[in-house]
Amino acid sequence: METVSTQRETASSETERTREAASAETTDATFRSLEEGSTISSRYSETASTASEDAVCWLRRTAIVMRVYGLLTLETAFSVLISALVWLGYPSLGYECRDDPSPLLLSCTPVLVLGALELTDHRHPSNGLVFALYVALLSFTTAGLNLCATAPIGVSSLILTWTLFVACNGVAWEHRLSSVWRDALFTSTLLTVMVSVLASTYTWLHKTLLCLYTVFVGCILAVLFQDVRYIATKMPVSHIIRSSLVLYATETLIYHTTLLMLTPVVWSARWDQMFSYLAKLGTYHHYRVDNGTLSVILNSTTATFQSRVA
């Protein structure tokens, strides 16, 4: 009997131990699940907060970029308006750039503006006055350079400029395209254009000029690519006006180069007759002034003589 009771006590104690172990395991599992749930919830909250911060940053960057390209659109529209007013308002106004290529010096204006903007960087003022001065300077120099070309050449140059400008901006904004593929695309396009030019039936002078134009515009587009990437990723709010002016000056430089390339008169310009047309105008004006002064003197002398005779 004692043995049976002992066995029963042992069995009951083992059962209690088993129950305690099971309850302990259940409790541990519950705690582990709670900890995992809290970890998952914390991770989810961190992910949600990170996503919200990224969304806010993206919205801010988009607003900055929209302001830059909005100013660029305004600048371009003003330049087109000034050139159109000069062409349509004064259709007889022209300039013999073959005999006097001095207006071609206006094509250096975008280079000077880009140099002033790039070299001064953060020290350059960025306000409405600077914006208006640069836009007026580039717009009126573009209108002056257009006097060397006809309206169809100007429109063709503008279309080609916008095509190159938009294509470069599109490649710069394509984040999924790796830098290797971008460089390969740029290099292959440049080489294809140069090979096509060399294989054409143009004279060697024209081929040389076209190759130089291709290389020069390629360098401009490479710099433009870096400027667009800076605007898309790192540009602060205080540089909105400056960055729009950089894009505008680059666009103007491409247009000036393309306009000169498509104007055959420039290729045979007489560089030894620089400012000769202005000198002729000055001589003609001086001649008219002298003749007018002489006629006034003669008329007054004649009137005095007649009064004395009378």
Curated annotation (Swiss-Prot):
Highest taxon of the lineage: Viruses
Membrane topology: Multi-pass membrane protein
Residue span of region Disordered: 1-28
UniProt biased composition (Low complexity): 1-13
UniProt-annotated location(s): Host membrane
Alphabetic keyword roster: Host membrane, Membrane, Transmembrane, Transmembrane helix
GO CC annotations on file: host cell membrane; membrane
Transmembrane segment boundaries: 68-88, 100-120, 125-145, 147-167, 185-205, 208-228, 246-266
Family: Belongs to the cytomegalovirus US12 family.
Protein name in the entry: Membrane protein US14
